[in-house]
């Protein structure tokens, strides 16, 4: 069962639309008279929504609907209140009920699209957003929704344009400013990002203290970054190749930082946007925090860890040197095999990055910059990628390109098919995790309990240690055309993590899946390339990952 039941609803809406068009009944409804009688109640609900009292707003909108179930304005308000609380199925249901009665409601289609997008269904969400804009071309929710699709699929210029327009249309909606801050920060426009977050704090509800603390710390960090001449400056060679040690199916590279001669051990971590360094190593290097504030969401322990920002003058990977590297500083819980840090996507995103689990080699290859927003699309609908000279680029012969997205929190996400589940699921592609993960929610919704094994696990995560973790043996896991059978996966609560991903992640593809391939990450074009290994592939140390790490 898909989390949002799109197919049956769409059939009913088409019938409803046909009936309405034939009868000529689209127009003024009974909701108008109800709105006049209940003006004060409606104003109270709208104020609660603006003030961040989403439960109070929900209660008041439900009271209006109890008086008149045909009050579509109240039902749309209820849908938005539920969406803000991430009650996605209920938000979807109420928006679809309005569309059944008023098929030409632009706001209803926009809210439906927003709920579908948050659930991770991009194709149907785009259809709803476009329908909304055909009905009303200044519907801010739909404009912002399409902009976020662009953001997740790494079309940053288009995303920023759309979010700026949404802010101009509805300057009182804090989420648009927050999302604009995210998009401009990712495109390294740090001043505009900090300004957007400042404006967000000025109008956002005061109810979420942790989120506000997190953003204040982020603003301080962005101001600091804005004072730097530039970030992630590339020095040295354009290409490098180096061997890595594989521990628990995680690639561990020898890295030098801040011009030091000593090699440090860093895990290649495509499950992190920014690089991370351990508190202990930061202390050895004399690395001090440049900003801090709020709690980050992650797997393990209580699902959160304190956000502390640092800054490295340089990081050397083989013959490649990257200068001015922002990092997180945090405690590492796994004491079985000590590492100094994790290399995040921002460090390697200017290269085609290859990980060969067969012969344990890591390669960086710098290519010409593509024209902005040139991506390989999901479903193959995008234009071919071209470099800055307008020339077509080509992929490596004999490999298959699989489109990937980037979450709000900077994780790499791909569509995965699991046997027994009809709809594809969004999974984080994480070289820093030793084992695959499925969310507790997915196990419950899709009745995967029949695959639960008797043994329990202990899992180390960024937010702490999770004890007595269930494990499922998935019969088939499919990424693109590639299939792995009998994939062991830890069952973890991912709800805290999904608070900041933007669209729902149902699991993590970890090392016990990825180690069977040669993988190339082409970040400019938004694809990964997979090539299955032969039978001669080397096995990693502790390849069964009996004590897994999910960082």
Task: For every predicted segment, state its role.
Residues 1-10:
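N-terminal secretory signal peptides that target proteins for export/translocation
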Residues 14-25:
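Bacterial N-terminal signal peptides
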Residues 41-48:
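Solvent-exposed, amphipathic alpha-helical segments
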Residues 52:
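Active-site charged/polar residues at nucleotide-handling catalytic sites that mediate phosphoryl
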């Amino acid at each position: 069962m898909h989390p949002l039941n799109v197919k049956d609803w769409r059939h009913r809406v088409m019938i409803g639309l046909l009936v309405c068009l034939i009868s000529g009944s689209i127009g003024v409804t009974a909701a108008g008279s109800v709105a006049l009688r209940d003006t004060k109640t409606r104003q109270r609900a709208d104020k609660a929504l603006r003030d961040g009292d989403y439960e109070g707003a929900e209660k008041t909108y439900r009271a209006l609907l109890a008086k008149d179930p045909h009050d579509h304005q109240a039902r749309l308000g209820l849908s938005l209140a539920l969406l803000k609380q991430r009650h996605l199925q209920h938000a979807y249901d109420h928006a679809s009920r309005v569309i059944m009665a008023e098929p030409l409601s632009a706001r209803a289609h926009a809210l439906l699209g927003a709920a579908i997008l948050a659930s991770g269904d991009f194709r149907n969400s785009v259809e709803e957003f476009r329908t909304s804009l055909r009905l009303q071309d200044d519907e801010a929710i739909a404009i912002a929704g399409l902009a976020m699709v662009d953001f997740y699929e790494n079309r940053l210029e288009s995303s920023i344009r759309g979010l700026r327009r949404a802010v101009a249309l509805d300057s009182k909606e804090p989420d648009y400013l927050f999302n604009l801050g995210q998009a401009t920060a990712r495109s390294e426009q740090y001043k505009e990002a900090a300004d957007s977050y400042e404006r967000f704090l000025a109008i956002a509800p005061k109810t979420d203290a942790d989120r506000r603390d997190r953003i204040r710390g982020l603003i301080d960090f962005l101001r600091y970054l804005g004072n730097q001449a530039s970030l992630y400056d590339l020095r040295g060679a354009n290409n490098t190749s180096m061997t890595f040690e594989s521990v628990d199916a995680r690639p561990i590279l020898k890295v030098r930082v801040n011009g030091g001669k000593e090699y440090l051990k860093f895990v290649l971590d495509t499950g992190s946007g920014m690089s991370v360094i351990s508190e202990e190593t930061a202390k050895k290097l004399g690395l001090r925090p440049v900003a801090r504030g709020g709690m980050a969401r992650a797997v393990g322990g209580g699902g959160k860890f304190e956000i502390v920002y640092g800054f490295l003058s340089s990081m050397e990977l083989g013959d490649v040197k990257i200068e001015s590297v922002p990092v997180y500083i945090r405690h590492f819980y796994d004491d079985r095999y000590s590492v100094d840090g994790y290399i995040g996507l921002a460090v390697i995103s200017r290269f085609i990055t290859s990980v060969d689990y067969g012969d344990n080699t890591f390669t960086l290859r710098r290519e010409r910059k593509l024209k902005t927003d040139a991506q390989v699309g999901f479903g193959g609908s995008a234009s071919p990628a071209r470099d800055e000279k307008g020339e077509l680029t080509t992929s490596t012969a004999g490999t298959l390109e699989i489109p990937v997205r980037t979450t709000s929190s900077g994780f790499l996400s791909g569509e995965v098919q699991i046997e027994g589940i009809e709809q594809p699921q969004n999974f984080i592609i994480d070289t820093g995790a030793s084992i695959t993960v499925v969310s507790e929610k997915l196990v419950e919704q899709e009745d995967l309990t029949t695959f639960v094994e008797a043994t329990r696990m202990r899992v180390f995560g960024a937010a702490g240690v999770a004890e007595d973790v269930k494990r499922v043996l998935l019969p088939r896991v499919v990424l693109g055309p590639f299939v792995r059978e009998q994939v062991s996966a830890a069952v973890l609560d991912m709800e805290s993590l999904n608070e900041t991903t933007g669209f729902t992640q149902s699991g993590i593809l970890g090392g016990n899946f990825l180690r069977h391939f040669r993988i190339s990450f082409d970040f400019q074009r938004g694809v990964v390339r997979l090539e299955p290994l032969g039978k001669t592939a080397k096995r990693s140390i502790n390849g069964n990952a009996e004590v897994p790490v999910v960082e």
